[in-house]
Amino acid sequence: MTLWVVKIGTSLLRGETATTIDGYARCFAGAMDRGDQVVLVTSGAVGLGCQKLALTNRPDTVVALQAAAAIGQGALMGLYERAMARHGRSVAQVLLTRSDLADRRRYQNASGTLRQLLSWGVLPVINENDALSPAELRFGDNDTLSALVAAAVEAQQLILLTDVDRLYSSDPRVDANAEPISDIRHPRELDSLEQGAGDGGRWGTGGMTTKLAAARIATASGITVQLADGRDPARLEALLQGQRGGTVFHPHPEPLGNRRSWLAHVLRPEGELQLDAGACAALQHRGASLLLVGVTAVRGDFAANQPIQLLDPDGEDLGRGLCSMDSDQLRAAMNDPSPGESSPVVVHRDGLVLRSR
């Protein structure tokens, strides 16, 4: 049994949306009939709302986008519900915000709810709660959301469907020398690609940049990611039957566990700690906890047990951790002229996750 998370982008849900969704539904039902489980993360609520309002351009204000999403979400779910019903399957709408996943208990509740739906043979249809989410609580794109959902349910496979056939070394629409890429085997290979990735289209929010970020999140959690052309549902059917297609992002050989994945990718840092070289070496090579003596600078205001970003001496991202002190306590301890015999723990190794190198 394979647990699949499939993300369908806005660019695939234009025009004859009902016909397109019918094709995807056949693929999902076929996989479920074979004993697999499928979670769908779908875009399209804003685009469908704009179609219903006969808008020629995507709204450019948050309020208008949220209103369009409110109109389109019900219609979108209706299309999926009717399409899956033709195959004797039910769907369940799950709308999420970042705050739903940032709280550890709610994160576990969301994971448990999705697992229960899957055990009943239901297709969970997930979207961001666009109609209500303020900017600071938004994922911003469904590529990221799909990777976080895949990690939460401990999926084996994440499929990112888009309107290009695979990843390229540069944008093939403007660069005739762009080279197709079939495999990405290490996070380092993503670095240069992320720098050259483009923005989203007129209707969507996720360009190739967000897909690469999603692949980084999922592969760090031990999930295989496939980026493929979803314009023909037959290609999705082939992927769900185990065939390769598009670009395959291979999982990290030492994946994060569920809690560390949550810490690394769901929580937003409330501040920064810059470390000296000795502390960096202790964290990276000896699996140590971060001690106060290794902290050279504190930035931001945060409470105890909130997530903070760790930076090396050059200001490069080292990882994230849950800080045992609030920012005022930490600054006071650093400035204490008579520290105790032992340096206190600032971030325990159990609440620490380092960036993949």
From Swiss-Prot:
Substrate binds at S43, D130, N142. Keywords: Amino-acid biosynthesis, ATP-binding, Cytoplasm, Kinase, Nucleotide-binding, Proline biosynthesis, Transferase. It comes from the Bacteria. Residues 270-353 form the PUA domain. GO terms for molecular function: ATP binding; glutamate 5-kinase activity; RNA binding. Pathway: Amino-acid biosynthesis; L-proline biosynthesis; L-glutamate 5-semialdehyde from L-glutamate: step 1/2. It is an enzyme of class 2 (transferase). Coiled coil: none annotated. SMART domains: PUA. Gene3D superfamilies: Acetylglutamate kinase-like, PUA domain. It catalyses: L-glutamate + ATP = L-glutamyl 5-phosphate + ADP. InterPro entries: AceGlu_kinase-like_sf, Asp/Glu/Uridylate_kinase, G5K_ProB, Glu/AcGlu_kinase, Glu_5kinase, Glu_5kinase/COase_Synthase, Glutamate_5-kinase_CS, PUA. ATP binds at K7, T162, D163, T205, G206, G207, M208, T209, T210, K211. The keyword Kinase applies. One of its GO terms (cellular component) is cytosol. GO terms for biological process: L-proline biosynthetic process. Its EC number is 2.7.2.11. Disulfide bonds: none annotated. Its main location: cytoplasm. Belongs to the glutamate 5-kinase family. Catalyzes the transfer of a phosphate group to glutamate to form L-glutamate 5-phosphate. This is Glutamate 5-kinase. It comes from Synechococcus sp. (strain CC9605). The lineage of its organism: Bacteria, Bacillati, Cyanobacteriota, Cyanophyceae, Synechococcales. The gene is proB.
